[in-house]
Amino acid sequence: MFDIMGAIHEAICLILISIASWFFNLYYFIIGHVASSDVVGGSFHNVFGNETVWNIVSSVHQTVVIPIAESILALFMLVQLIKISQRIDATATLPAVKDIVFLAVSYVLFHWLIVNSLGLLDAVYGVFNEITNSDALTGASIQLGNMTLETSGLDLKKASIGGCFILVITAFFSAGTGLIAYIVSIAVATARAIQLYVMAAFSPIPLALLGFEETRQSGISFLKNFCAACLAGAIMMFLFAAYPLILTSMTASLGVGDLNQLVNADSSVNVTGVVDSALEYAFAPLLGLLMFIGLSILLIVGLVKAGSWAKEILGS
């Protein structure tokens, strides 16, 4: 005999599970493609997809910043000449040959650093970019984008409407958190790219400051901060690569990978080793599903702190 109530029950559960499946698949798609932009791992000339912004950086570097840096270098040479003349007046002797040679070598070295500063920073970025684009990171970061919520083996007769409804709510918030993670990742990666370009455009000035003992630490700090900004891209890619692995391992321990466990009112999901109460038993699937949201928030926090972590690694 045809069970009308059972058919209605299964139809409602199927609709709810289909909605939840769509949200979860959207979540997987968003997080899986969060690292696909060139802003994180693109070449220094094509961080924004083309060389338009790079041409602006190069133009500002050549026409505006280099003359300022050369003026600073000229001031450095003047200060050194004054020091040499003071020693001549104090000792009434000609300067040693080594002083003249040191002054000439210093000028040639710092002039070369100023003129070629853009190429030097490009090479430094390339070294860190090799880490960012290594197979160990880029290969793992796309795993989550190929994941989908499997519903083919679902037994609708054992599913509960309440469990399916909780699944929809959690899937909705998971997709929303994934959208936020994507927006934050794009914002952080773009801000990092702009920071790198600004530092590259004005790099001749801190490099020229290396000539003065009083300002030498400023030039060293600039180089360390630029390396930290480059390393931040590798840290972000590491987060993208580690995230799906952490998500898979932690949610698997709660049975989240089995959809029957999530919606079946008669299933047993072990959260703490032993389900101590009926309330904990009823909401155990919800605890596992909420882990999606918690781990996505963790990803957002990690992306925001990637720059500070890079500075801590380099001691800058």
Question: What are these regions, as identified by a protein language model?
Answer:
Residues 66-79, 295-299:
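Hydrophobic alpha-helical transmembrane segments
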Residues 71, 75, 79, 107, ...:
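Hydrophobic alpha-helical transmembrane segments in multi-pass membrane proteins
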Residues 5, 12, 16, 20, ...:
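Non-cytosolic segments of integral membrane proteins
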Residues 1-16, 93-113, 219-232:
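Alpha-helical transmembrane segments and their helix-start/interface "positive-inside/aromatic belt" motifs
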Residues 72-105, 202-217:
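Hydrophobic transmembrane alpha-helix segments characteristic of membrane transport
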Residues 1-72:
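Binding/recognition "hotspot" determinant
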Residues 208-224, 312-315:
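Alpha-helical transmembrane segments
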Residues 57-66, 98, 102-105, 191, ...:
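Alpha-helical membrane-interface segments at transmembrane helix boundaries
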